[in-house]
Amino acid sequence: PVIFAEYAMDTADACHELGLKTVAVTAGYMHPGPAKEFFAKMDAANVDLKAFTDDFYFKVCGGRLQPVLDTLVYVAHETSCWLEITTLLIPGRNDSDTELEQLAAWCMKELGPDVPLHFSAFHPDYKLLDVTATPKATLQRARRIAMDAGLRYVYTGNVHDRDGGSTHCPGCGRPVIERDWYKI
């Protein structure tokens, strides 16, 4: 986590000395200065794009959307870090067609068609016990919206969806890597 950025960077250095690769799984809410140093040490990053409205980021996360978008653009265009994005879809909170269309259009325009995007299912735990789990159909709808926007590698997660979890050739649509839960 970025809150332990120095520790993560030291750990990344130690991993690299042993020939190991490093992956940062982060909310991406970083000041540009530390982000430069942090992502220079990482081989890959999975950034949580929690929603595509500033209102959600402010009310639910206590932050703002723009710094996360800035981090995504920075990692995609200014580093050698492999980038993937994950959005946890929470029913009624960040899963409207409009928001998903805006998210997909932004990713296509700012990051390009080849940055993988994962839509994960929410499960009611901890503080959001009053919200139902994300239906598989919602994830499939989000995936279709993103693919229709031109994104080539869009996945569903936290549900059993063999097609949505597999990698398909963007040219012919055939499965290249078939995943079934944790089986490849």
Predicted regions and their residues:
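Conserved AdoMet/S-adenosylmethionine-binding subsite of the radical SAM
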Residues: P1-T134
